[in-house]
Structure formats: structure tokens, C-alpha cells
Amino acid sequence: MLLKSTTRHIRIFTAEIEGNELQPSDTVLTLDVDPDNEFNWNEEALQKVYRQFDDLVESYAGQELSEYNLRRIGSELEVLLRQMLQAGEISYNLNCRVLNYSMGVPQAVV
């Protein structure tokens, strides 16, 4: 059975990607970061999110694979994205389809 957690910027599925389709899996989690391209990313920032995801998944090892636990992981990754935005590691994509500043209005350093 396919389980999923969807937040504004993080989507987690209990599935593998085969072609362009998600195939349910009991052993694989698939992470989709910023599916709406709201942020500008570099490889280092993406790797930081992936490492945190791996650490969180490992910390839940042995626990039930449930939508609740997937939501907890997704929520913790959202917190990381906010911290990265505030630290300047990522920035808003001004060419995004919709500018809604979901993590807060950009701050100018004076």
C-alpha cells in the first residue's frame, strides 16, 4: 500500500520510481524536495536535506511505517528548510509560478 506525507516543500512516498510512475514499496522511501520550485537550490543544499532525511529515516528504524511517522519526518525537514532559508543557504526563486513567501517575507540586512 502506498503511504505518503505531503507538506508545502517536502513529499515522501513509500514507493520506488519506475519510469515516470510510483510503484508502492515496503522497503523504499522516495523524497521529493520543493516540487513547486519555490527555492533556488545548489547541490550542497540539496545534499544537506538528503543527509538529514537519511538520518531521520534511520532514527525511525524499527518503528511502524505509518503516515504519522512519515509526517513527522516531513515536518522536521520543513524546519530544516526554514533554517536554511534564514541562513542564506537557499533563497526564494523569484521566477517561481507563484510568489507567496511561504516561509516568511525575505529579510534585508541593514
From Swiss-Prot:
Keywords: Membrane, NAD, NADP, Plastoquinone, Quinone, Thylakoid, Translocase, Transport. This is NAD(P)H-quinone oxidoreductase subunit M. Belongs to the complex I NdhM subunit family. It is a peripheral membrane protein. It catalyses: a plastoquinone + NADH + (n+1) H(+)(in) = a plastoquinol + NAD(+) + n H(+)(out); a plastoquinone + NADPH + (n+1) H(+)(in) = a plastoquinol + NADP(+) + n H(+)(out). It is found in: Cellular thylakoid membrane. PANTHER family: NAD(P)H-QUINONE OXIDOREDUCTASE SUBUNIT M, CHLOROPLASTIC. NDH-1 shuttles electrons from an unknown electron donor, via FMN and iron-sulfur (Fe-S) centers, to quinones in the respiratory and/or the photosynthetic chain. The immediate electron acceptor for the enzyme in this species is believed to be plastoquinone. Couples the redox reaction to proton translocation, and thus conserves the redox energy in a proton gradient. Cyanobacterial NDH-1 also plays a role in inorganic carbon-concentration. It comes from the Bacteria. The keyword Membrane applies. One of its GO terms (cellular component) is plasma membrane-derived thylakoid membrane. NDH-1 can be composed of about 15 different subunits; different subcomplexes with different compositions have been identified which probably have different functions. GO terms for molecular function: oxidoreductase activity, acting on NAD(P)H, quinone or similar compound as acceptor; quinone binding. Signal peptide: none annotated. The keyword NAD applies. InterPro entries: NdhM. Its EC number is 7.1.1.-.
